[in-house]
Amino acid sequence: MSLMNLPEESRPREKLLALGPKSLTDAELLAIFLRTGIKGMNAIELADKLLKEFGSLRKLLGSNENEFCSHKGLGTAKFAQLQAVVEMTERYLFEKIEKEDALTSPEHTKRYLTRILRDRHREAFYVLFLDNQHRVLKGEVLFEGTIDAAAVYPREVVKRSIDYNAAAIILAHNHPSGVAEPSQADRRITKRISDAVELVDIRVLDHFVIGDGEIVSFAERGWI
């Protein structure tokens, strides 16, 4: 059935305008992005099918071009649109933490870091550089690979912190396994970085480990 044949209150776009985006299901939100369906399926039916094939909305959003375009109804134009949406989301979240104290707005910081790191297939070590009022100056992936393989160099963190004239930093990295519990290697590298930056009067305020649906804070554990 075409979306135009549905009652107006059941059409995703009209429903969003009347009740707000939170009233929509994942399939309805995706249908608005897709705009059209394929032969034999309207946009909602196609969206529902795609969500089942990918496993979740998050996995769809985190898919690469080959994965995305291998599904019927999706192509390079839609992939480009999706990447634009994802990038706008990341910039929006970064703007929110950039204008606020990263410590007094920890949920915004966690949301941003989760968005940046959660769906990466390799470990990535990310640093937020803060001024003396704990406002964000810059965020950057400094290292990629396995943290346990000594891929994180404290001297590089010190160098970048000085480059940005940072007074404090927040560390973060992901666990592709999905388990956010910090390892002993995570704790060792945190101490090494903390000791290194303290020599130039810079503080590590926290280290977040991002898993699948969970995030662990070293500061909340009392480890920093």
From Swiss-Prot:
Keywords per UniProt: Hydrolase, Metal-binding, Metalloprotease, Protease, Zinc
GO biological process: proteolysis
Cystine pairs: none
Protein origin, superkingdom: Bacteria
Residue numbers binding Zn(2+): H173, H175, D186
Motif (JAMM motif): 173-186
InterPro entries: MPN (IPR037518), RadC_JAB (IPR025657), RuvA_2-like (IPR010994), UPF0758 (IPR001405), UPF0758_CS (IPR020891), UPF0758_N (IPR046778)
GO molecular function: metal ion binding; metallopeptidase activity
NCBIfam families on file: PRK00024.1, radc
Record PANTHER family: DNA REPAIR PROTEIN RADC, UPF0758 PROTEIN YEES-RELATED
Family in the record: Belongs to the UPF0758 family.
Protein name per UniProt: UPF0758 protein VSAL_I0192
Organism field: Aliivibrio salmonicida (strain LFI1238) (Vibrio salmonicida (strain LFI1238))
UniProt lineage: Bacteria, Pseudomonadati, Pseudomonadota, Gammaproteobacteria, Vibrionales
